């Protein structure tokens, strides 16, 4: 495992995030109270306009997140034993994001992350994440979420050509700590991976 590759990928992802389109940077910051954005209801518009607005608001939020990948589990029902034995399931890496909770307590984030993939090659990913959150009334500090991420990744075997990667998201959160996961669908001996990471908000 080459830690220099991970560091370089994280730096490049961070540079991309910091130099995203000026439309994101021009949106004024919104007020913050106890970790939640004080926002007016979302403006009317088509799906694309709402997506751009949500990305912009997350980008301008003062709240930050650290991402630590912890596991890539390959579905044993869709892989040969030989393949499983050859794959890496410890995706060492790190990521960074900016997030907000909207007026409905739903989570929005823009993020960049880099980790070691199944073949021990560096894989970067960056994108926008959204989750509808449920807050149990009698369990203070807990949140449960389900949603999606619209992301772009790049892999060694595809010569690091950027690839779109929309995926589902679910999470369990307690205060600032979250366990978040996605499932990457695929075919036999390809894809079908449960990817899990820890998210720490600061």
Swiss-Prot record:
Transfers a fatty acid residue from the sn-1 position of a phospholipid to the N-linked hydroxyfatty acid chain on the proximal unit of lipid A or its precursors. GO terms for molecular function: O-palmitoyltransferase activity. InterPro entries: LipidA_acyl_PagP, OMP/PagP_b-brl. One of its GO terms (biological process) is lipid A biosynthetic process. Homodimer. Residues 1-25 form the signal peptide. The record marks 83 as: Role in lipopolysaccharide recognition. Keywords: Acyltransferase, Cell outer membrane, Membrane, Signal, Transferase. Its EC number is 2.3.1.251. This is Lipid A acyltransferase PagP. Its main location: membrane. SUPFAM superfamilies: OMPA-like. Pfam families: PagP. One of its GO terms (cellular component) is cell outer membrane. It is found in: Cell outer membrane. It comes from Yersinia pseudotuberculosis serotype IB (strain PB1/+). Belongs to the lipid A palmitoyltransferase family. The active site is at residues 74, 117-118.
């Amino acid at each position: 495992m080459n830690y220099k590759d991970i560091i370089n990928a994280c730096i490049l992802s961070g540079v991309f995030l910091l130099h995203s389109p000026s439309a994101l940077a021009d949106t004024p910051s919104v007020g913050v109270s106890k970790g939640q954005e004080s926002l007016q209801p979302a403006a009317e518009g088509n799906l694309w306009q709402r997506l751009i607005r949500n990305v912009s608001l997350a980008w301008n939020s003062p709240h930050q997140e650290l991402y630590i990948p912890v596991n890539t589990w390959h579905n044993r029902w869709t892989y040969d034993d030989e393949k499983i034995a050859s794959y890496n399931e410890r995706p060492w890496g790190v990521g960074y994001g900016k997030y907000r909770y909207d007026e409905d307590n739903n989570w929005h984030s823009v993020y960049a992350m880099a980790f070691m993939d199944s073949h021990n090659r560096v894989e970067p990913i960056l994108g926008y994440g959204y989750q509808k959150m449920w807050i149990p009334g009698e369990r203070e500090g807990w949140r449960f979420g389900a949603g999606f991420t619209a992301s772009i990744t790049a892999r060694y075997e595809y010569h690091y050509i950027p690839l779109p990667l929309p995926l589902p998201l679910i999470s369990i959160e307690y205060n600032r700590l979250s366990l978040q996961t996605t499932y990457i669908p695929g075919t036999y001996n390809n894809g079908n991976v449960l990817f899990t990471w820890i998210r720490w908000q600061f």
